[in-house]
């Protein structure tokens, strides 16, 4: 069995009790620098804060602290410039950076930084720092999609379209009302990120491997320097829990689902059969064999990536479900799912925002279909209710009107809608159906009548747009201060 040429006792962080280094295959399995080195700057920030609390506890003198901070600053410059990258034998981001620091300031100085901390509390803290930063980035990008939806809604204040349930015509609604039905879930996703951030703003630093530290260090000072609001109450919980990562993965998956629902509609709307929208050339692709094709690839990729984001969440939850306290090496698998979720959203969201912002809506086509498919049947029922007819009877009478339309359509060989019913047709169905019922059989009348809070009446949609714009501004102040 081949063994590593780098015994951990010489260059790593843990090898003194071992007679030899790990097997080559073991080292390859254990290695994580290929994905966790993106945490390097957070690791260095944590090391600066840790050096200061070691100094405050009397464990570092002034000269050593100065040398450590200078070495960490120089190392960060090399990380940022690319002059420093992990070596093949480096196990993880922590060991890579400690090796580099020791090379710069010497073992006597660099080796003192390890006191009072473990990779267990380090990585738990760094992951929170990374996710908190990227939560704001993701939130800002989600809000770009919201802004695109609201801009389209504002640009089409009176445009009507078919509202659907079960994908069948249901009732007319305003296009703006429909678009904002996608905006509100995305605004809630940003609320979830903000709520999540309050829970993530608790620092595990100082928890050590699991039991805390006996060196008189000040975890609160580290937490404050790293942008946290406080330290964890329980050191075992601090090192062993990953609900913060799982919750972030859930919000990411929920964002993916919400984008997928928008995208599914765009895909349908762009078909010849619907002809509700034309996609902008910049957000479409073509075919290698069919010259006429204009494909909604942004929307299709959004649908596909929603599944990927759900997979990130379920994979992480499956990793966590059977772990006893405290830290277990399984937790090395916590990072790639959330890294992937971040990377996926940060490339997907700008494309969805661009697609939505440049959609060209064919409002005449949408308006012509808004009342079709007997979509005004509920208006007949509610007209009857306003005249004292019990809704059970009103529902039956309105349904009979639909059936009469279908009977005439078969007999006449053409489409017959509710407004095509004659006075005689209506009277034959029910004496309650006076000729005045025809006054409600219009898209405009139907829309205007839905004037309860949250309804699709133009006045309510205008109020809703203002409220959504206010929410957008408030969230942007958090995401992009």
UniProtKB/Swiss-Prot annotation:
It catalyses: 2-(N(omega)-L-arginino)succinate = fumarate + L-arginine. GO terms for cellular component: cytosol. Pathway: Amino-acid biosynthesis; L-arginine biosynthesis; L-arginine from L-ornithine and carbamoyl phosphate: step 3/3. GO terms for biological process: arginine biosynthetic process via ornithine; L-arginine biosynthetic process. This is Argininosuccinate lyase. It comes from the Bacteria. It comes from Kineococcus radiotolerans (strain ATCC BAA-149 / DSM 14245 / SRS30216). Disulfide bonds: none annotated.
